[in-house]
Each structure stands twice: as structure tokens, then as C-alpha cells.
């Protein structure tokens, strides 16, 4: 097996609000190797976003350990986190709120570079490279986020994540707010960047077809627990777990004939599970 | 994009407000003349000549006359302005120095500092300011500077609260998280991302607090508890008041100065707020997508429909077409894949040659027959057509899918049929026949009659479409009481039946729940129950499953299919998901840039898409496509060759 970039071992996260504790994640164990994409799929409330946020240090883990490049980062200090930001980046779901509306694209992209002490001129040069990398015109630098469409804003967010040449990018539903045709182009850009730079992705999505398109390995989450994990072919076309099966069968196929069959299979699953209950 | 299209700045909007400009000019004059007192006064403000007491205005050497001690009022007014304004400024600076950092820290970090500082702010605000100032004067002696320093502390919660609230609002923004992950220090995040947002409220608050400080300061001096050794507007008020019977006019000048300054500050503050809020509201509108249509509108049966709330949803759909600034450079999106480039040339609507809908005449057998529908926004040279020449028919028992990407005009078409186009939008051409009735010429009120029993609507966001302050049950039964004339008990029974019918396990409990107590999937079932409650002939569902989890979506689609065949409804399903289309639709109309580019029965459309746009859309669906392993293998083979 190739070298592990990130290992998550028995991660658990509790949220406490008004003295009641809610367990968002339990016993989450998986790892990501250099250059691979691990897809994290689940429905709302499954805890998939919380996993990404605790790896990024935005949510403190309650239990378990996170190991990045052999180093324990479970409770990394803010200073350590600032160092880690060179290797670990993020692309969020909503391209409308993940970019500060009052900063220009150049200001947004130069921010991580300047934070690492890169001088203004060098940062400016890198911003041009980054815009080119995500195929935005170089005159985009002086404009504000609101002048761009959703797909273009998401390209800006990708460029920001790439600025420090990270080894791992956490992608939290990065295409679910986009139109169909835009979605596919942005996904293909993710794949192309991975082939060129060798960075790894933790790709979080509710959509099994998106996960199938970008991931080498897939983890299925339900109510804060891993219900199934494995290679993409197995999990997305012939899953073992009943929940994964239901998840797969619930997504309608863009083909009336095939969808009729899928619907009948789903109905069978439903009747079976009701009988079991 | 030309610079004239650039969104105007806050300064532009402020300058476009005449009242605010007048306020700014008045304030500038007052400040400037006080600053230049030594040049403009022409007399020593403290020079007293008892012989010259109470000279009338326009006396030689005394443009505004003299006071009871024979001092020049004009000079005292100018020098007094220096003292009064500087005193108020001192209070403001102290308030800002305490309030803003405290607000930033409390809002950004929260925890113990937040609790302690909120408690302190409450304490300071609950103390009566005047009493504290009087006590301070008794202990520390009469000094305008000391009293203004103390008053600054009393004012500081004003800044603290505004800043804290604003920071708490932006703290959760994704771009702040992104900045953290980018490795920015907290100080840099606060300086770059947080201060820019709270800057506006701070400026507005400052103009108001400055006015308050000036008024309190003058009030103290008027009461005679100020430092009367220096000329200030408040001291002049006090002196004028003492000689009010001999020379009432001496009271006028300081009153004018104080009044004008305070009024100017309030006007400027309001102008700034308007200028800043206009910007804020436009960005908020883009941020808050697809929301709020009230349940009553959704169930389409109550006469009162929150059209305002509908506006936002619909405008969003229209946004890329109506707002020049928003959708500027989609060309870069099209550069990426060449085939899309030829989509720029959308041909005339395909219904005229490639669909079973050749006839331009309305179809009398259809429940709904739309012909050459055009929807436009605005009027004159700036009007924008968002729907062009749309023609479609829906028969009883048939589901028509209206498919397209955002901005394609699919929701606009649906709203035109519902008669719920947002303000500024109207049908500019064409006809909409519902059961043989022309809807485009009917009044809003008479279209309203149709809703519920004739046409019903299911919205996209179930949660925001139920009124949070009413129980689910009353939101379901009220429309039935109004529309079907049922009494309360019968409406309840029918509502419970409906809840049971839409697959809600404990109808009674859901009936007595508030919307926040049920899940999104349940809420959508409730809305569907409401939509079909009055047995409509036509159901318009606008992305009814987009906000739902995929397993819930499958159940909701199953429910819709059953209800539709039970009630022989005609259904228009607006969606962007071809899987949903394949699952439930009989016929499909594909929309792009406001026109229907292709219309066909569902089997033929998927088997033989004719229009290049339909082909591109179908080619973009990932469902059933290659996996990443397949893609990598293909790439490796490509490289090998």
C-alpha cells in the first residue's frame, strides 16, 4: 500500500448544546493515501461534513486520533494549524458565501500566499498562474466575486485551495450548488488537477454519482457511523450494506426503461425491509 | 463589461441622496468655521466690555451682537464650537476605543469574555448617565473634558452591542472558515474579513453617538454644572437663558448651532445607513437562495398569497437574465468545452417543427394550453424578456417535465401560469388557457379564485414554506374550510386523512406539531397534502424534491405518482434532474435561455435527443456514467497511445 497521508482512527465528535450532548460521529476509522480520492457519501445528518471539518481543525474531535504525515494533529495548536495549512486545504459547498464579497479575486487568492510570508510581487505572479490553472481569464483578478457565476466562483475557491500547493484538499460538497453542465466541468477540473499535482482529496457529497465519478475509494456514512467502505466499483455498483443499496436505488436513472426497473427493485427492497421490521 | 455597468459604490449612493448631502454640507460648514475661529472671529471671545452689553445683532464689530457681559457672540459661537465639538469627539473616541475592541473580541471568541462583557455592558447601560455625570462633577470638579471622558465610557455599550452582533453574524460565514484554513492569524482575519463587515454599522453608530454626546454635554452646561470658564455652546445657552427677558435673541444662536449639528448628524447617519443597506440587501438576496413561499401560497388555496415572498424565489431564477452585473462572463465556462459554444445560437423554438405540438392553435382537450407565452421584466429600453414564445399543453392525467438549468426560464413560465409573477414581471404576449379560460387577461383576484381547486402549487423548499408560528394542522385545514366550505371538524378529519394518505405515520401528532418539529421530508409531504387537498385539476411542482435527501426523494416521487394517477391530475414538474424526469414524466419540454428548445414524449427524448442542448445536458448527467477507475484507465490508455 502506498504511503498514508492522513489516518483517522476511531474519531468521535460530540456536540453539546444547552447541556444535552449529541453524538455526531462515532468510531470513524479510515485513511487517505498520497494522490488518491476518498469519497465520503451520506445524507443530511450523517456527519460527513463534520468529518471534514474536524480534519481541518474547525471542529475539535472528542475522541480518537488524527495523524497527518506521521504526526498527531488531533489537538494541534493554532500555530501548528497555520503550518498545516500549507499541506491541507478546503473547497466549500456554497460558492456564494465562501468568498468574501468585498475582496477582489486577487485579494482572495493572494491571502493564503501572503499569510505564508510570500512577498507581494511573487504573490501576484502566482495568482496569475492559479487563474490560468482553473481556466479563468487573467483579467478576473481585479473583479469582485459577485461578477461571476456559481461555476466560476467555485473555480476561484479551487484556485484558493491550490495556492499553497497542498497535499490534501477537503472538498465539502463542492459541486452540489452548481448546474448540471457546470458540475461536470468542475468535477473534471478536480480530476485533472489531481493528475497534474498528485494531491489527495477527501471528497464529501450526498450524491453517489458524483462520488463515483471522482473517487478511488468510497465510505458510506449513516447517522454518524460508517456502514460500508471499499473500492468505488464495488460500493457504487454492487453494495453489500442494505442502506447503501437503498441509497443507490433511490437515485433515479436518466433513462425511463432502466429507471422503471430500478424503481421496481427499490420497491422490493422497501417491502423486504418493512417485512423485516 | 463597460465600467458604467459596475455596481455603484456606497459613496455614490450616499451622494445621490440630496438630504444626506445637505446634512454633510451643513456639518462641514460648522466644523470648518469652528476650526478657523481665530481667522473668522475677529474678536476675543473672552474680552468683556460691560458698556457694550446686550448689543443687538449687526452692531459695529459685533455681527451677532454681544451677551450680558459684553462679549462678542459671533466669536464665542465659533470658539465655543471648538470646545463643544472637541468635547463630543472625545466622548466618541473613548466610546469607540472601549466598545469596538470589546465587541470584536466578544463576538469573535465568545466564551467567558463574552459573558463578562455583556454583563458589564448591561451594568453601564442601566446606570442613569446624567446622575453619574453630576456625581463626577461633584467629586472631580467642573471640567468638560473629564465629564466627556466619563460620558464616553457610558456610551461605549452603544458601539459594543452593534459590533458584537455584526461579528457574530459574520463569524459563521464560510469565507471566515476558509481564511482560518488558509493559515491566517486571528488578527488578520479580524482585520480583513470582520472589520470590513462591521465598518458600516460603526460609522452609522458614530454619527448618532456624536449627536448624543453633544446634546448631553450642552444639557449639562445649560443646567449650570459645566465648566463656565470656557466658551461653549452649552454655556452660551445657560447665559442666554439667564437673560431671556432682556435679550431673548442671545438664546437663539447656540440653540441653532446645537440643533443644526445634531440634525445634520442624524441625517448623515440615516443617509449612510440607506447607502450601506442597499448594498447589503442585494448581496443578501443572492446569498439567501430559493426560499420562502408561505404555506398558504403553496397550498394555493387561501386568498391571501404572500407575493412578496414569492418574488425572491422567482427573481433568483431570473437573476442571470435580468441583472447585467451578475452573469458577466459565462464565456469562460464555455471555453472549457467546445461543444457548448455553438449553443450560443439557440434556434427558434423547436415546437414549430419537431414536436407533436405543431398546431399553433390552443388544444381544447388540454387542461392547460399555453401559446407563444412571453414574460418580460421592466419596461422601455431596459426591459428584459425572460421567457420567449413558449407553447405547451398538459392533459388530464399527464405529467409534463419542464427541464432546464438555472436561468432557463422554467420557474418564470410556471409562475406566469400561476399568475404569481414577481413585481415588475408580466406576460407581454401569448395566451394561457386553463380549461378554456384565458388567464392572461384575468385580474389577479380572479386568478386567485382558481388556486387550490383549479391550480395548486408545490414549492422547492418545504421548510421555509410552512409558517413557523402556526401548527401544521391549522395550515392544512384553513384552506379547506375556505375553499371547500368544510366546517372545522370536517376539515380536521379530512386533513388527518390526507396526512395519512401522504404516508405520515402518526397523523394526529403531525397535525398538532409546529413546522420546526418535523423533518424536511415530512414538511414536503405536508405541503403535498395541502396542494392536493382541494383536488386541483392542475398541479405545478417547482423542483419539489431538490431540497430533499435522495432516499426521501424516491418516496416523495412515489407519492406524487400515486396521487397523480388517483386524482387524474395534470402535472407540470419543474426540475433540473433528468433522473426525476425519467422516473415520473410522460412528456418533457427542455428549456434554455427562455425558450423551449425541444419537446417530446419521455421515451423518445431520452432515446433520440434532437437538439444539441438536450444532448449536452443528457451527456452531463453522471448517473450511470463511468467510475473514477474507468476514467483513470481511459486516461492511462490515452497516454499509452
How should each PLM-predicted stretch be described?
Chain A
Residues 251-255:
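Conserved NTP-handling cores and scaffolds of large molecular machines
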Residues 1-250, 262-277:
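ABC transporter nucleotide-binding domains
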